[in-house]
Amino acid sequence: MKVLVLNCGSSSIKYKLYNMDDESVLAQGGVERIGLDNAFIKVKLPNGEKKQIMHDMPDHKEGVNFVFKCLLDPEIGAIKDLKEIDAVGHRVVQGGDKFKESVIVDQSVEDGIEELCDLAPVHNAGHLKGIRAVDSLMPGTPQVCVFDNAFHSTMPDYAYLYAIPYELYEKYHVRRYGFHGTSHRYVSKRVCEILGLDQNNSKIITCHIGNGGSVAAVLNGKVLDTSMGLTPLAGLMMGSRCGDIDASAVTYLMDKLNMKPQEMADFLNKKSGVLGITGISSDMRDIEKAANEGNEKAQLALRMYEYRIKKYIGAYTAAMGGVDAIVFTAGVGENQTDLREDSCKNLEYLGIKINKEVNDKVRGEEAIISTDDSKVKVVVVPTDEEIVIARDTMELVAN
């Protein structure tokens, strides 16, 4: 079975085509700048070479259509006929209370995703455009939605509710949903395989640290708690997002800066985090470089960033009554060695000891970076959200 995985954003489409017989990647790439000037597709060839092709893409339908053309291309493609694609799996950011597991797309699913656009206006609208484009270009091909927050749906009410009048949850569904769920799901299962743990009797803390970041407490294979909230703004300090903040600080600043709600939302999402503290960049590689060169704001941002991660590790260890393993994943977590070390520093009393020599060498590969006598294992696991989506798609379509 061949499964195409799509992640359709507001102006982009990332894709991977899998042969599910052996889970090999047949083709992958991404479309950028849909609806804008200078739109293009980047294709990664099987030999690792990357090819960029400029192409006018006014909307998602043309974006998906051009992905199909590239898949069929004799030089850079991987198939001879679109009928070779048995199913399409989509990443969908917000499933709300409606979707607690992956589903085959039908009209009611499309309607449900549209209803949830209030909670994720940019993301869900992009996903819908992708779903409808595939339906238009490949009618009758089964499509599956895998929801980013579905893995977090096992959170108990005392963990996901906010301490505001209960009727606001009932009426407006205001609660903690969490995000990066497909990543947390993959790495929490994979770390148990690496360490030989029984997932149904395990206490895992997963740290998905990229430009956006979140931590999850996974108890016996199910999420007990996670750091992101109603939106991806809560929790850790991030590239350009503030993370946890006193709600009164927000209303105070709105008054002082004469900001409207959407302006404040943009401010907290796009101009805060390490970018806001340093004024340099939202990219942690730039921040680490500046810190090493003596930039005091960059050094402060790193301390703040690592301190938040450490606080969540401590909090979730308490919430689960202990921890067996801590996982670092995503771009920053997989590649920035100092951040991993400093986030676990002074946690020896919890049984967490980093092997500095091993940790310093590990970038983007599976590895245990704790010492042999560390009671808690610290592990780097590169995430693979696409294979989770492909597996769910195959399973649902096959059944």
PLM ranges: what are they?
Residues D266, G273-I277, M284-A319:
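Adenine-nucleotide phosphate-binding core of ATP-dependent small-molecule kinases
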Residues G9, H90-V93, I209, V323, ...:
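Glycine-rich beta-strand-to-loop/alpha-helix junction loops that act as flexible
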Residues L71, E75-H123, V144, F151-A159:
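Short beta-strand-loop/turn "lid" adjacent to the catalytic site in phosphate-handling enzymes
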Residues L219, D225-K260, D266, A330-K361:
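Catalytic phosphate/nucleotide-handling subdomain of diverse soluble enzymes
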Residues M1-G96:
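N-terminal glycine/serine-rich phosphate-binding loop of ATP-dependent small-molecule kinases
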Residues F151-D255:
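Glycine-rich phosphate-binding loop of actin/hexokinase-like ATP-binding domains
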Residues Q299, R303-A319, D324, G333-N399:
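Internal helix-turn-beta structural module
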Residues C70-I85, V191-D198, I313-D324:
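Phosphate/pyrophosphate-binding loops at sites that engage ATP/ADP/AMP, CoA/4′-phosphopantetheine
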